[in-house]
Structures are given as structure tokens and as C-alpha cells.
Amino acid sequence: MANERVVSKPVPCSSLLKDEYMTNTRWGILYCPKHGATGAKKRWGKIESCLRDNGIDFDFVQSERQEGVVRLVNMFIDNGYKTIVIVGGDSALNDAVNCLMSASKDVRESIALGLIPNGVMNDFAHYWGFKENELEQTVKWLKERRIRKIDLGCIRYVNAKGEKCHRYFHNCVNIGLISAIMNLRRQTRRVLGSRTLSFIGSLALMVFQRLDYKMSLKINSDVIDRKVMTVCVGNASGYGQTPNAVPYNGLLDVSVVYHPEMTQLFEGFYLLFTGKFLNHHSVHPYRTGEVIVNEAVRALVSVDGRMMKTPVGPYKIMVEQEVINFIIPA
């Protein structure tokens, strides 16, 4: 519990939001500091000042752990908050949408979810035009409360215990090399601490990383049965891999990348960072309502930038349309 705290000026945490009027007007704000970053208290001070300058009534909780995020978002839901704002990145937002999807439809439809970008990866925030260094503009947009119902992707799989599981995602699922790179960065950062050093260390370890995986995929009427470098299934921009995806058309964009030559691999990274990823001849784009993964031998899987335990056997990735009320720029 050392990484969690609750701040609520009018009442203690155990009594939060007992009054119906207060539940309808006050925001529940969950602050997730960047892992390993300094200045978290200073960053929150700026956010708090901006909220008060804009006349926002709110209660504030903080957590740096996934378990804490889930518990505290569920606390907001159970106590009747109608506006929940995540100050964090893609992973924290993923926890929040999964908590909302665990609630009943009536409860979920009564809640609006907002986002102030503050994570290591803020791809979904950037998709909508929210920027880390434009705090005042972000708060003003959230105050306008312009709501759009958005889709969520969902991966359904069986775990190592034989249990049927599912996980929702707002941005993307990665299978293969990109997930392996994310895993390398997580491991090297745990050892090296610095984001820059972990990035350099990840690049060095890439020399020993396998670059393709035996996969069997079914996308629409196409069956792909061959070695594949990486697959991105995007509900939104997918860190540049599914740049044309939109989270409100009831469909998923899929980029399947075959194994290019080493020089072409570097070209692919260049096109990824310049927003022209689909122009690479090794990238094969699709648009679909469902992806069936019959086989992906030893391919790691990540959901919204966070590693998940590799599914056992075949699994499906699909979309659920207009299930979350999301506050977008006015």
C-alpha cells in the first residue's frame, strides 16, 4: 500500500461520494506516476493547480501498481463517480477500461472516462490530440465533457491452467517481434534503470532475438500459414503500425509483417517513425471484425503495450462496438 494514497478534502476515503449530487458532479481522478521517473509530486502539483484554476471539483487517488489501479478504479465505480479521469499512459487506461467492462452495462453507460497523458507510452492520448505538455488545454477539453462512444478490441484465449480468459484493449495487440522488443525494454530497464540505457540495451540484445515466428492466422477469407515477423491488431493507431485504424467503426486494422532483409528492417523502422509504415512492401494490411490465431509458435503477446502471459493454443481477437463513453477534445 505504500505506492497508493487517497486525497479527498471533504471526506475520508471510506466515506467517498455517499451524496448523490456529489457523485454526479465531482471527478474521480487516478494519478499514475511514470515508473522510475523523478518529479512525480511536482507533476501532480501542476495538474492539481490546473484543475482548481478551472473550477473542477475532484477526489484524487494515486497508485503506481497495476493491482492498485484496478482496485481504485473499481472503488470509483462502486462509489458512483460519473466522471473518472486517468492521469497515466496506455497501460493504466487499459486497466480502467477492463474495470468498466466488468461492470454492468447500465453502470458503464452512466460513466464517462477521461484521460490526461502521463505514461511512458501515450499512444491513445496522442491519437485524439491530447499532449503531455498541453495540460491546460487537456483540462479544458475534459471540462467540456464532449463524449464519444468508442469501440474496444478483445482477445479471448485459454491460459496455462485451461481457464477461458479475455482482455479488452483500446489501442492494439502485438504478436511477435514488437512484443519481444517491449519485453526486452522492460527487462533491461529493470536492471539498468534509465530509459535511454534500457533502449540502447534492448537494441544490443536484438542481435540475439529471433526475427520470425511460425504462425497460422485467419483474417477474413485469407489464411496465412507461414513465418511472420510481427502482427499488430489495432483498434486505434497501434504505435504507428495501424495508422488508419479508428476506434469507432466496428472494425480492427491488422498489419502482418513478413520477414524482411536486415536493410529492409531498418527501412521499416524508419517508415514506422515517419507515419508511412504501410508503404513498406513487407507489410500486409487488413481490415476485419475478427482475427483467429490458430498458431503462433513462441510468439510473445502484448496488450496496449503491456506483456501478457502467452495464450495456450488458438485464440481470437475481435471488436465490441461503442461500449465506452470516452471524453474527447471539444
Language model segments and positions:
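ATP/nucleoside-binding phosphotransfer catalytic cores, i.e., glycine-rich phosphate-binding loops
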Residues: 219, 256-330
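Short Gly/Thr/Asp-enriched flexible loops that form oxyanion-binding sites at enzyme active sites
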Residues: 91-105
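Short amphipathic alpha-helical segments
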Residues: 41-43, 97-100, 126-128, 244-245
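Internal helical hairpin/lid segments
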Residues: 227-279
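Catalytic core of DAGKc-family lipid kinases
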Residues: 54, 102, 106-229
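Glycine-rich beta-strand-to-loop/alpha-helix junction loops that act as flexible
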Residues: 87-89, 118
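Short hydrophobic-aromatic micro-motifs
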Residues: 162, 166-180, 225-234, 239-240, ...
